[in-house]
């Protein structure tokens, strides 16, 4: 019993030491966060400079840089006592997306029904075959005197 009681008080300082990047109980310093997030944006812009512009829409070309950027914004938000994600950080990240990925919209293919000349046979043929096969089964089941 006593050894457990002795270990508990030592556990709290250890947890506090390990949680140096945890949000502070005093609240979020939004001004500090807005000052620190551009450092992450600049680092990301420098890394994206290594990627050809025409490859910016291919996530596999820069996923490591984007992960580093995301980790940086999370760390900077936590350092100033803010949770992540939060509206200010999301707004900053959205701005980075507009800067680098605004031309990466996916053109969705507008799907249309095929023309009636194609659609009608695609519907009628399976229906007719199903009715014909059901009729054949009924007809054969009535003729039990001969085997196939």
From Swiss-Prot:
One of its GO terms (biological process) is intracellular protein transport. The record marks 113, 141 as: Required for CALCRL interaction. Residues 24-113 are extracellular. The chain crosses the membrane at residues 114-138. Residues 1-23 form the signal peptide. Heterodimer of CALCRL and RAMP3; interaction induces allosteric modulation of CALCRL function and ligand specificity for adrenomedullin/ADM and intermedin/ADM2. Heterodimer of CALCR and RAMP3; interaction form the receptor complex AMYR3 for amylin/IAPP. Interacts with GPER1. This is Receptor activity-modifying protein 3. The gene is RAMP3.
């Amino acid at each position: 019993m006593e050894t457990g009681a002795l270990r508990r008080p030592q556990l709290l300082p250890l947890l506090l030491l390990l949680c140096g990047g945890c949000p502070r109980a005093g609240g979020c310093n939004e001004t500090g966060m807005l000052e620190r997030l551009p450092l992450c944006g600049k680092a990301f812009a420098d890394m994206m400079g290594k990627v050809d512009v025409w490859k910016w829409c291919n996530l596999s070309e820069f996923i490591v840089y984007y992960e580093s950027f995301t980790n940086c914004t999370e760390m900077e938000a936590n350092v100033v006592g803010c949770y992540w994600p939060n509206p200010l950080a999301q707004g900053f990240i959205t701005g980075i997306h507009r800067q680098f990925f605004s031309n990466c919209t996916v053109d969705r293919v507008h799907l249309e029904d095929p023309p009636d000349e194609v659609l009608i046979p695609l519907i009628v043929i399976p229906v007719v075959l199903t009715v014909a096969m059901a009729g054949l089964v009924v007809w054969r089941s009535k003729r039990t005197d001969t085997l196939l």
